[in-house]
Amino acid sequence: MFESEFARTEYIEKDRVVFHIWKKEAHFDDYRKPVIDSLEMLREHKNSIFIVDARNGFEDVKEDVEWGFDYFLPELKKTGCKVWGFILPVVSDIEGEIDLWTAEIEKNFRVIRAESYDEILKTANDCMFNER
């Protein structure tokens, strides 16, 4: 588990989920450190689902978006992760940010947007069952 004033990340074994919760706005190292810790958990627990609670979300600075697209997403793909879930309210103040990330993430991952952890998990499990 990782926890800072900006984020909390944990592996939930029963669900095979790396759960990343943003607590408040973070940029540069305060943003990247929790994301790297999530990545390490995803490397350790191959083929896990990645769920990001973005209800306390924020607009990323340009440098963090570039870092995410150029470093994080290619590394995430190597972990075997196939599903990325966003926990968000029906209407979010960061729609543009989520749309930007979703467009890039969907190139390699199934994106699920829902209002709860359980809703994402159910949808992810249904999708994986239907792919068999």
Segments from the language model and where they lie:
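Amphipathic, Lys/Arg-enriched alpha-helical "gate/interface" segment within cytosolic domains
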Residues: 1-132
